[in-house]
Amino acid sequence: MKKHLCAAPECTGCLACLNVCPKHAIGVTEGFLGEILPAIDEDKCVDCGLCDKICPSLNPLPMYPSMDCYAAWTKNETDYVSATSGGMATAISKSVISKGGVVYGCAAHGLQVKHMRCATMEDVEKLKGSKYVQSEMGDVYQALKKDVLEGLTVLFIGTPCQVAGVKNYLRQEYGNLLTVDLICHGVPSQQSLHASLRHAIRDIEPTKVTYLSFRNHVKGDFCLECRGLKKDGKPFLFERGIDYSNSYYPTFFFGNSYRNSCYQCRYAYRQRISDMSIGDFWGLKDEKVHREADNGISVVLVNTDKGTAFYASMQADVHSHRQPVEDAIAGNAQLNAPTRRTGRTRCFRFLARYCSFETAFRITWMDRILKSRMKYCIKKIIRK
């Protein structure tokens, strides 16, 4: 591998370039935090230029101002209870499946998080839950294009940069493709997650991880949970909330461990790349809606005529309350600007170039770690 495409700090890792290359001349390398970066093998490259033509960083797509905003949640009680917000990703996916379409979304397979094709309601169950890590796209591009060209209704759900990758890969608009982007704060690499878990769970066997979850309403909403078998065959259960006893959540929630491109994200604004955008409705002011929904509420931003028509078609499946678009924008930082590089973030990223993920975390957050441990010790003494 001898050269990169767009500048590495601008690369979103969508890998549309890798999938479009007719000579398989593009492979993958890793940055210092494990983020995936495409690299061209010049011995195989024939300079056809396809990779340059479909790169979203080199060829920006038009963005859409949100037309309507809704506070919404699914009417399916089972889906609502197991949802990490209002269950709207599941509701939209099931609506597409019920109409004979297919869905491409993100699922956890052990410790591997990747996009997959779903053609049944049972498949959609695998997509449930937030994944605070960048998913692998794999060969999703080719499969999605085949479905689109065959005339199936196709739903793609992903981060805005993944949506941009899909759109540029297809190179034209298709009426039977519906895109939904997740309002995104930034994505750490899967290697960052693995490094954090390897430190926390001694002798973890990645191939024998049976369950991975990033949110759990019963256990305090934001809870990193991992279950499986160690190398010696003994079972383990790992659970951590947003505290400083584990490195993953602090570095994620405070924006230390994202891709470089996340700090200059062109999609972290009120103009959106997709037909619809969904996420947590942090800025909701309607108290009546708060009282009506007891588990979680999604924000649904409808950005195109196609999105409007589809959302109207699924009203029987959801509770939906129109809200001012400005409420959603005011309450969600990532609808206003990309995540900032704070002093701690700069410190963490500098250290991570020269030492392990865990060491960089412990040095960067030493004051908070010590404070957290002191609180724990004091509480333990008081209980006695």
Q: How does the language model describe each region?
A:
Residues M1-K2, C6-A8, A39-D43, S245-F253:
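Short, intrinsically disordered, charge-biased short linear motifs at domain edges
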Residues K99-V102, D203-K384:
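Long, compositionally biased charged/polar accessory segments in the mid-to-C-terminal portions
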